[in-house]
Design a protein with these regions (language model features):
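Short, small-residue-biased leader/transition segments that mark boundaries at the very start
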Residues: 1-5
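NAD(P)-binding Rossmann-fold cofactor-contacting core
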Residues: 9-28
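Rossmann-like dinucleotide-binding domain that binds NAD(P)(H)
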Residues: 143-207, 213-218, 290
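NAD(P)-dinucleotide binding in Rossmann-like oxidoreductases
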Residues: 186-192, 203-270, 288
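Beta-loop-alpha module in the N-terminal Rossmann-like domain of NAD(P)-dependent dehydrogenases
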Residues: 34-93
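A contiguous active-site-proximal alpha/beta segment in oxidoreductase catalytic domains
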Residues: 58, 81-142
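Hydrophobic residues in well-ordered beta-strands that form the structural core
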Residues: 38, 76, 101-103, 132, ...
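C-terminal helix-rich "cap/oligomerization" subdomain common to oxidoreductases
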Residues: 50-53, 203, 274-318
Length: 318
């Protein structure tokens, strides 16, 4: 993902790269005239202003703390950590820090989702009442990935937890989850689910529903629908092309875009833009470390609900 961010922006200079894969580090550095260093060397370099953390999840909290101690601006990919306890500890340690710390929930910056949020905030459909987020991957990841991912709720649905907080403008009070392994039995053997639905309740009675699946045969399905007191807003799928074939007995459209980088490449650029703008103008970042911890707490609540069959109160985890 570090490569993706760099390719999407011309107003920042890539100075140094650290990667456990030497070949990847050298290739990226060569493309952009950077040098390869260790992570500690990068963090301690006084000439480096900002750090992008796109490492394995179990290293995120450690790198956030180290980079914060060095007063670097930080953009860290989601999630903050696989452990909610560790993520909260990280938040406590850097809470008083003055350096910007942003968590990379790129879907907030998708132009269609951002426009939906703007329309909501402008009051175009009145009060929020019922939110539905659909997120289906075209195919499941390798089992080797599943085993280290932290599970569907922490790895996949965490995007939608953050997106629901962004759209609703507040956290839910309780979550209920149902999940099963329907796509690949090996995912179940690995201790995870590949198909899940989470229902969330809010203090004033609003409801949100998130639907996830690791498989959608027709492509990458990413939709949002929100019902308000005065109307409905929908963000639909982006298709491979806009050609519509109409016949006497059927109308055929193209399938949704298949791969997440194809769909969300613009959101990564917009996210990096927002990060740089905050750093340059000394303004608060749009997605905080606290936001990241909240999304992780929701993932933990969903996991507990699935395992116990009970609704989980979010305040018990925050």
């Amino acid at each position: 993902l570090g490569d993706v961010y760099k390719r999407q922006h011309r107003e920042s200079t890539l100075d140094a790269v650290a990667d456990i894969d030497d070949e990847s580090a050298n290739n990226l550095a060569a493309q952009f005239g950077a040098i390869v260093k260790s992570a500690d060397e990068i963090i301690s370099d006084p000439n480096i202003d900002a750090i992008l953390i796109a490492t394995s999840t179990d290293t995120h909290s450690d790198f956030i703390e180290k980079a914060s101690s060095a007063f670097k601006a930080i953009l860290c990919e989601k999630p903050v950590d696989l452990s909610l306890v560790r993520a909260k500890e990280c938040l406590d340690k850097v809470n008083a820090a003055k350096n910007p710390i942003m968590i990379g929930f790129n879907r907030r910056f998708d132009p269609n989702f951002a426009q939906l949020k703007k329309s909501l905030d402008n009051g175009e459909i009145g009060n929020r009442e019922l939110l539905t987020i659909t997120s289906f991957d075209p195919a499941p990841p390798p089992i080797s990935y599943v085993k280290t991912s932290g599970g569907l709720y922490r790895d996949m649905m965490i995007h939608d937890f953050d997106l629901s907080n962004f759209i609703m403008g507040e956290l839910p009070i309780s979550l209920s989850a149902v999940g099963h392994s329907l796509v690949d039995p090996a995912i179940g053997v690995a201790g995870d689910v590949d198909t899940a639905v989470v229902t969330m309740s809010y203090a004033d009675g609003k409801i949100a529903v998130i639907k996830n699946s690791r498989r959608a045969a027709y492509g990458y399905d990413q939709r949002i629908e929100i019902l308000g007191s005065e109307g409905l807003l929908q963000a639909e799928n982006i298709l491979e092309n806009s050609v519509l074939k109409s016949y006497y007995d059927v109308v055929i459209s193209s399938k949704p875009i298949y791969f997440f980088l194809e769909l969300y490449i613009g959101s990564f650029k917009a996210e990096w833009d927002a990060f740089l703008k905050s750093v340059r103008n000394h303004k608060p970042v749009p997605v905080t470390l606290k936001d990241g911890v909240a999304a992780l707490a929701m993932a933990e609540a969903a996991t507990q609900s699935q395992n116990t069959g009970k609704s989980i109160q979010l305040k018990e985890l925050l």
